Curated annotation (Swiss-Prot):
Cystine connections: none
Subunit structure and binding partners: Homomers. Can interact with PIP1-2 to form heteromers.
Domain of life the protein comes from: Eukaryota
Molecular function in Gene Ontology: water channel activity
Membrane disposition: Multi-pass membrane protein
Record motif NPA 1, residues: 112-114
Spans through the membrane: 43-63, 80-100, 131-151, 173-193, 205-225, 255-275
Gene3D superfamilies the UniProt entry points to: Glycerol uptake facilitator protein
Induction: Expressed in roots with a circadian rhythm showing an increase at the end of the night period, a peak during the first part of the light period and then a decrease.
Biological processes, Gene Ontology terms: protein heterotetramerization; protein homotetramerization
Organism: Zea mays
Protein name: Aquaporin PIP2-1
Keywords of the record: Cell membrane, Membrane, Repeat, Transmembrane, Transmembrane helix, Transport
Role of this protein: Water channel required to facilitate the transport of water across cell membrane. Active as homomers. Increased activity when heteromerization with PIP1-2.
Amino acid sequence: MGKDDVIESGAGGGEFAAKDYTDPPPAPLIDAAELGSWSLYRAVIAEFIATLLFLYITVATVIGYKHQTDASASGADAACGGVGVLGIAWAFGGMIFVLVYCTAGISGGHINPAVTFGLFLARKVSLVRALLYIVAQCLGAICGVGLVKAFQSAYFDRYGGGANSLASGYSRGTGLGAEIIGTFVLVYTVFSATDPKRNARDSHVPVLAPLPIGFAVFMVHLATIPVTGTGINPARSLGAAVIYNKDKPWDDHWIFWVGPLVGAAIAAFYHQYILRAGAIKALGSFRSNA
């Protein structure tokens, strides 16, 4: 039996083909009625709080690691101190896993303007919802990093405020490429983990969806921390840059917006028009109307 064939057993032991799967309708580009819905504002608040918590935990982890490995502060034990790059990657991936699990049923658990942008391009969310989500995510990120500075004021500026910047020895093109590829991996994983066709077939998939998303964030951090400090989330990069507010994070800040947005757009196109055969369906519809 092909994997696209679904067979059910009848009461008399016979078999018959199940109904064909139907994709949900695309979200409207502009849904004015949505502005009067409490569910929209509840989702926006959830995105704000989730992004605030994400930035607070992760940036605090980065600052703590740099302090623990600072030879001038920790002495001879500095080389063996701290959680290491592996621990930082786990902090980012683990928090995404937790927060997506907590907020998926309310807002979809985006916590990232690049994810929201990719889902908007795929017509999964309306323009109104996408814009409000992105604003909430950016404000939440700024507030989250602000809390880190308030609680760790002695170390925040000294250790770079957890801000993203291009590492020495790497060109802007390399940094941009790292952000594009890293965000592609993340957004592609989001599309695959939340694919309604897969969810319709396997009832356990919605419960497990946060796991591959968090793991994708973890793996991307391992690969790109040495290059850009790993952005793949424009709100994360903006929040740290605004609160730290030094020249270095702002010099190449455009990389942490252009890279993730391009990566998200490529992932949306790949999933919708290649894997889900959107281009073939559109071509077939065009031919049938010709």
